[in-house]
Amino acid sequence: MRIKFWGVRGSFPTTLSTESIEEKIITALTIAKPGDISSEESVRTFVANLPLSVRGTYGGNTTCIEVRTDSGELIIIDCGSGVINLGNELMAGDFGQGKGSANIFLTHTHWDHINGLPFFSPLFIKGNKFNFYSPLPDLQERIEYQQVKTHFPVGFDDMEASKRFFTVKSDEYFHINDIKIYSKSMPHPGGSYGIRIEDGDKVFVYTSDCEFNINAVDDIRDYDDFFKNTDLLVFDTQYTIQEALIDKMSWGHSSASIAIDIAVLYEAKKLVLFHHDPGYSDDKLNTILSNARSYINANRKAKDDFLSEIAYEGLEFEL
C-alpha cells in the first residue's frame, strides 16, 4: 500500500509570502560555501541537501491523500485543494482518456475537505468512474450544494464522469474488493469521521479533524478497534498544546503531544503530524516537529523504533 500527501493544511489554503521566499534565499546563501555554488551541478547538489523548509515548503493546499493498494485500487481521502494537483497528474493517464476509476472517501464536508472538488479535472471527463463513500447519508446533496449556480458556474451534475454515492456505517467494516475499511466518528464540531484501511497485513489510519484532550486519552477505549495495530497513523495536530487546551479549546483540533500519547498508547509504528494551521510558517512547523520528537524521547512508554514525521506535499510512504 502506497500513501501520498497532496494537501496537508487545515482550514484554508495558504501560499508563501514574498518575504518568506526572500528569507529562504538568504538562509541558503548564508549557508553556502564557495564550492557549493561553483557550477550548476554543485548548486543543484547543494540545494538538494538543504532542509525542506529552506529549499521548499511543507505546502499550502488543504487536505487530500492518495492511497494505492497492492491490488491497484485508488482511494482518495478528502478533496481539499490538494486534490487539484492530484487530478492534474491523473489526467496524464487513464483518467485523461475517460478510462479511469477511483474511490473517494470524504470524512466530512467542511470546506477545507471539499473545496478542490469543483476543480478536479477527472470529474469532467465522460467515461471516468467515481465511487463516493461516507457515513454521511446526505453527502451527495452537500456536494451538489457546493456547486449551485450562486456559488460556482459549473454544477456538479455538469461534470460528466460517472458518480455513485454509498453510505457506509460507522463502527462497521465495509469492503472495496479485497480492501477492508472501517470508519469511526471523531470529536469535531459538525461531525467528522476517521478512516482505517487494511490492505493485507498493513494498516493505515487517518484521523483528520479530531479534538482529543488529556482527559480523553485516559478514557479512549471506545477507539481500541480503530487505532490498534497501526503501521501508519496520520493525526490532526493543527494546534499547539496551549491552543488545543486553552486558547482554542472546543474548536475541534488536537496537538502533537496528544497525537503522540495516542500513537504510543496504541503502539502505532509511525505517526505523521497533519492538518497544519494555515498561519504556521515552515519554521513554525519545524519547531513543532522538533518539540514532538523531544516529547517522544521523554516518553518512557514510546518504543525505540517509534517514528514521527510531519506531513508535507509530496511525502510518500510504502507499507
Q: Where do the model's predicted regions map?
A:
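Cap/insert and terminal regions of metallo-dependent hydrolase folds
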Residues: I214-L307
